[in-house]
Amino acid sequence: MSEVPEPRIIENPDGSKTIISFKIDGGKKLKITQRVKEIKITEKVNKSIAERRKWAKYGAEAGSGPGPNLSTTKLAEELQLRLAPSLKEVREQDSKEKEKEKQEGEKSLYVCRTCGIPGHFTTKCPFRDILGEMSGPAEGEGGLDAAVDTAMPAASAPGKYVPPSRRAGGRDPSSDVYKDQRERDDAMTLKIMQLNENADEMTIKQKLLSPFPNVPRVAVVRNKETGRSRGIAYVTFASEKDAETALRLLHGRGFMNLILQVDWSKPKK
């Protein structure tokens, strides 16, 4: 039987190697060709970790090479070490939270007379141009009341009946002042229909209108005799922009197993 030739290694242009070897199997000489490519992998580790890997082993592992010995060491998943915050950081966080609570408490001490929302003064109300200053003083000493009273004729004789709108301090409901206010309210009020009977004002505010923190008024229409909801509610928003956004988001949306129908409120004729 002929001798088995020595293995040959051929360097290829692409950096790989072709290894040709021979062996005898069942009286036959077999030629085995293998093509391998060496890939160098560089692992970057922390400097301190690299130093610890050089430490000399002791005990039963004395004299063993670097790295874990699978016969004596069991490898498990890598665990990330999370250090608890220091006492100083905890105290700083508590201090910030207390300061924030203090500021919120100070904001609630004053309420805007224009929109009724706490946190800012009447003179700095962001809804001043929309809501107007119906309760604030107007130009002149007597303000708006004095201007209206001046235009109202007084009773010509004592004992004569004077309508409430023409009495001192009264305002005519058909005047431009009330008309403008109604128009502003209608422009910021939506009519929500097909509401679940169990949805009250608090539920609508907290669950349906949660994206709108400033909702001045929510009124559910109820049966006068039974007090049950008729599935209709009127919602007045802080601005016309908020009302338009709510109309776009809520119309056709499912709420408490019913599909809502939302539209602008219609003034009573």
From Swiss-Prot:
UniProt region (Disordered), positions on chain: 155-183
Its cellular-component GO annotations read: eukaryotic 43S preinitiation complex; eukaryotic 48S preinitiation complex; eukaryotic translation initiation factor 3 complex, eIF3e; eukaryotic translation initiation factor 3 complex, eIF3m; multi-eIF complex
The molecular function terms of the Gene Ontology recorded here are: RNA binding; translation initiation factor activity; zinc ion binding
Q: InterPro entries given for it?
A: eIF3_g (IPR017334), eIF3g_N (IPR024675), eIF3G_RRM (IPR034240), Nucleotide-bd_a/b_plait_sf (IPR012677), RBD_domain_sf (IPR035979), RRM_dom (IPR000504), Znf_CCHC (IPR001878), Znf_CCHC_sf (IPR036875)
Question: Could you provide one GO biological process annotation from this protein's UniProt record?
Answer: translational termination
Q: Which residues carry this modification: Phosphoserine?
A: 64, 135, 156, 165
* Record-annotated RRM domain positions: 188-267
Q: Which domain of life is it from?
A: Eukaryota
Keyword Phosphoprotein set for record: yes
Q: Which UniProt keywords apply?
A: Cytoplasm, Initiation factor, Phosphoprotein, Protein biosynthesis, RNA-binding
The compartments listed are:
Cytoplasm
Q: Where is the composition biased (Basic and acidic residues)?
A: 169-183
Kindly give the SMART domains that the UniProt entry links to this protein.
RRM (SM00360)
Q: Which SUPFAM superfamilies match?
A: Retrovirus zinc finger-like domains, RNA-binding domain, RBD
Role this protein plays: RNA-binding component of the eukaryotic translation initiation factor 3 (eIF-3) complex, which is involved in protein synthesis of a specialized repertoire of mRNAs and, together with other initiation factors, stimulates binding of mRNA and methionyl-tRNAi to the 40S ribosome. The eIF-3 complex specifically targets and initiates translation of a subset of mRNAs involved in cell proliferation. This subunit can bind 18S rRNA.
In the record, the note on similarity to other proteins reads: Belongs to the eIF-3 subunit G family.
- Subunit record text: Component of the eukaryotic translation initiation factor 3 (eIF-3) complex.
Recorded hits in PANTHER family, A to Z, give: EUKARYOTIC TRANSLATION INITIATION FACTOR 3 SUBUNIT G
Q: Which HAMAP family match?
A: eIF3g
Q: What is this protein called?
A: Eukaryotic translation initiation factor 3 subunit G
The organism encoding this protein is Eremothecium gossypii (strain ATCC 10895 / CBS 109.51 / FGSC 9923 / NRRL Y-1056)
UniProt lists the gene as TIF35
